[in-house]
């Protein structure tokens, strides 16, 4: 790649969060790209001899469904910053449009007021065309952009500090090595995950093609299973849910889809849902995890052509979640349904007895309370 490859190492609340890697569009806006490049390297000073650099500065303004803004290394509040050409420099051109998420564009206070501040789009922003200069894009770790985008804010400032701990530029050899490592990991059989968390951010795969989405989801399932066997239930849950997001690009396949493809989607989606539910059940109990299990298993139960054992498993896991939610009536109903599907299952029988005993004890307690009130 002939264009410059730059990076930010990011911390969130002073904890390492990962690296954002950018391609700068030197071929279209060389002056603007050069400004960003040298602010990443930190090898320039202003007339007063003060170092000009992004390292140590923060993202001071983040608006979900719009953009993340940073680059004010002098004041940190959006009123400062300085370019390598002086305090401000002109708009180079508006050839590139804000037609997609993950673009780098210059923040400004009007025409010809570019400094060091920039923003990363998280959605298409065509209303900014002709006003802000697009000069790059995020190429790796777009999931980190989404993570930052979803941090709660106060007056648009992230409640957790999002800091550029270090920044720089990759040499062509370093970038070639990075690409080779990614390709080897993708081609390998070790279950590596190199895909973005959200299908719409992944450029290496066309998730709109069912076959490609299926391949990614299958590999992510392998990663999740590996993590599950290692006892890393939170990580496994994350991988299973990520795999579901790739499958869910196609909630329903076209009517003319091959029967084999339809069955492949069904037979992969089902274990992803039930395995994710199992992972959530193994995490510390909370209203969020139990609600997630109910949601996942309820989805599983809507899938076509479920076998008796598949239906029984989903009902049993949903019943476990209802127990955590203290909804014993719903749990008992699901357990009785599960027992019809898998007669004699020891786990189902035990939990059903426990639930029935709890309901009986509760009814007796209520009876005694009423007796005292009206006795």
UniProtKB/Swiss-Prot annotation:
<dbReference type="Pfam" id="PF00160">
    <property type="entry name" value="Pro_isomerase"/>
</dbReference>
<dbReference type="GO" id="GO:0003755">
    <property type="term" value="F:peptidyl-prolyl cis-trans isomerase activity"/>
</dbReference>
<keyword id="KW-0697">Rotamase</keyword>
<dbReference type="GO" id="GO:0005737">
    <property type="term" value="C:cytoplasm"/>
</dbReference>
<feature type="domain" description="PPIase cyclophilin-type">
    <location>
        <begin position="7"/>
        <end position="169"/>
    </location>
</feature>
<comment type="function">
    <text>PPIases accelerate the folding of proteins. It catalyzes the cis-trans isomerization of proline imidic peptide bonds in oligopeptides.</text>
</comment>
<dbReference type="InterPro" id="IPR011990">
    <property type="entry name" value="TPR-like_helical_dom_sf"/>
</dbReference>
<keyword id="KW-0802">TPR repeat</keyword>
<dbReference type="GO" id="GO:0043231">
    <property type="term" value="C:intracellular membrane-bounded organelle"/>
</dbReference>
<dbReference type="InterPro" id="IPR029000">
    <property type="entry name" value="Cyclophilin-like_dom_sf"/>
</dbReference>
<feature type="repeat" description="TPR 3">
    <location>
        <begin position="312"/>
        <end position="345"/>
    </location>
</feature>
<comment type="similarity">
    <text>Belongs to the cyclophilin-type PPIase family. PPIase D subfamily.</text>
</comment>
<keyword id="KW-0413">Isomerase</keyword>
<dbReference type="GO" id="GO:0016018">
    <property type="term" value="F:cyclosporin A binding"/>
</dbReference>
<dbReference type="InterPro" id="IPR002130">
    <property type="entry name" value="Cyclophilin-type_PPIase_dom"/>
</dbReference>
<keyword id="KW-0677">Repeat</keyword>
<feature type="repeat" description="TPR 2">
    <location>
        <begin position="270"/>
        <end position="307"/>
    </location>
</feature>
<feature type="repeat" description="TPR 1">
    <location>
        <begin position="217"/>
        <end position="250"/>
    </location>
</feature>
<dbReference type="GO" id="GO:0006457">
    <property type="term" value="P:protein folding"/>
</dbReference>
<keyword id="KW-0963">Cytoplasm</keyword>
<protein>
    <recommendedName>
        <fullName>Peptidyl-prolyl cis-trans isomerase D</fullName>
        <ecNumber>5.2.1.8</ecNumber>
    </recommendedName>
</protein>
